[in-house]
Amino acid sequence: MKKKKQALKVLLSVGILSSSFAFAHTSSAAPNNVLSTEKYNKEIKSPEFISGKLSGPSSQKAQDVVFHYMNTNKDKYKLGNENAQNSFKVTEVVKDPVEQATVVRLQQVYNNIPVWGSTQLAHVAKDGTLKVVSGTVAPDLDKKEKLKGQKQVDSKKAIQAAEKDLGFKPTYEKSPSSELYVYQNGSDTTYAYVVNLNFLSPEPGNYYYFVDAISGKVLDKYNTIDSVAGPKADVKQAAKPAAKPVTGTNAIGSGKGVLGDTKSLKTTLSSSTYYLQDNTRGATIYTYDAKNRTSLPGTLWTDTDNTYNATRDAAAVDAHYYAGVTYDYYKNKFNRNSYDNAGAPLKSTVHYSSGYNNAFWNGSQMVYGDGDGTTFVPLSGGLDVIGHELTHAVTERSSNLIYQYESGALNEAISDIFGTLVEYYDNRNPDWEIGEDIYTPGTSGDALRSMSNPAKYGDPDHYSKRYTGSSDNGGVHTNSGIINKAAYLLANGGTHYGVTVTGIGGDKLGKIYYRANTLYFTQSTTFSQARAGLVQAAADLYGSGSQEVISVGKSFDAVGVQ
């Protein structure tokens, strides 16, 4: 059972750098609820999270304040002979509605080539004072010999190398892409192409390959769509049917979900036909039928009387209703308009393939298999599954945590956390288990993962027990248990490894983690960096001396993350 569970817990997933354990110092609060924190990478001794009054007031643009600070501290950031303006590119500038600060997102570059996984977030107060700099740098790039040479491999050959390593000919969902990066491969730093292979057949995959631009060798790879089973026989692809939105009038229907409960459905009436198309929210919600094939999105679900009680309707009923619940949660709690915060439509496809034991976000929509009836029932029947997967989309459009090692485990944990909080929001038999409603229908009380007791399914509940191998993208579905346990303790309280945590409730848990994921976490955030970002997020929301700040720190103490 344990081996089975280890294989199956990779169900809930999305799309490289692993940082060593860091040391930190946190002192009393600086003005405006900014904690004075210094956290450095233990190996390269560069800052990972610095907060406090980092500069005086300024009338300069926020990015210029950040560049001035980094130039003043260029030795700490190990920029070598380059200045900050040549070492970082501003990729986003947004306003923080809580602190009225300007948040600047930066991408590290070398010779105008982006450095994989090396991004920074900086918070500049309304008066121009720099408050926080968070992120990971690749050090001393001007000293790396391989970066002084010329690339020998072009983009086309890099794609060919990735396809050869893949070992089979897929049916692509979109054309392969390739982009040149500076890439850290352990202690080696070189130019590498990041190749993306996105396909549905013979088994869904969204691979990222790292191909050395000098030698043409594959340095690393990972898949951001995980499958329960191994590669299957090819499922014949049908020609993509028309799946255009319809124009009509809003209607209210009803239907029975996978577990037999009745739900109200927002639909569209057009030419005497009802469609599972909800036009009433800031983002339109569409639900499609793949008809047991693998072509996406399929056909828009239709009905003649707006009553969806047939057995085959159940998966569509839940996919449609739960997508709406998840949208409402993010909109009502955080004023977020869909996963991209810009009203992107929420598309779901059910009855994907035949007996398919998986659900995934493919970068643009949700996809649900029917399960084989023994391991899983239709996977859209789990609200926490839908909340989990759509949260991957939120993360992709905010921190964009790389789906490997600690950043990948943090990515998974955030999806588990918000999948659970969406379940509590709808108040439909909520709990701190993941996938319990759709997993092993013949076994009562079973689930994929437990946030309250990760060890129940073989996952670590303390940093000292973390998985250190390379399987499962470096243990993203395993080490997520450490963050899951911290989150559970933060919401509910309890004593773990001799550390007592005062619970603050699920609502505050969500606010703190959402703020950190959107305004403090960067692509390569480690558990230690996450702690610093979450503590500061709590200080922003509730005050530097608040119980919430204390509880966040204690929750990480309890799982051994400093």
Curated annotation (Swiss-Prot):
- Sorted alphabetically, which keywords does the UniProt record give? Calcium, Hydrolase, Metal-binding, Metalloprotease, Protease, Secreted, Signal, Zinc, Zymogen
- Specify whether Calcium is a keyword of the entry: yes
Propeptide positions in the record are 25-245
Residues the entry annotates as binding Ca(2+) 4: 439-440, 446
Gene Ontology cellular-component terms for this entry are: extracellular region
Q: Which Pfam families match?
A: FTP, PepSY, Peptidase_M4, Peptidase_M4_C
Named from the GO MF annotations, one term is:
metalloendopeptidase activity
Which amino acid positions bind Zn(2+), per UniProt?
388, 392, 412
Functional description taken from the UniProt entry: Extracellular zinc metalloprotease.
Q: Which family does it belong to?
A: Belongs to the peptidase M4 family.
Q: What is this protein called?
A: Bacillolysin
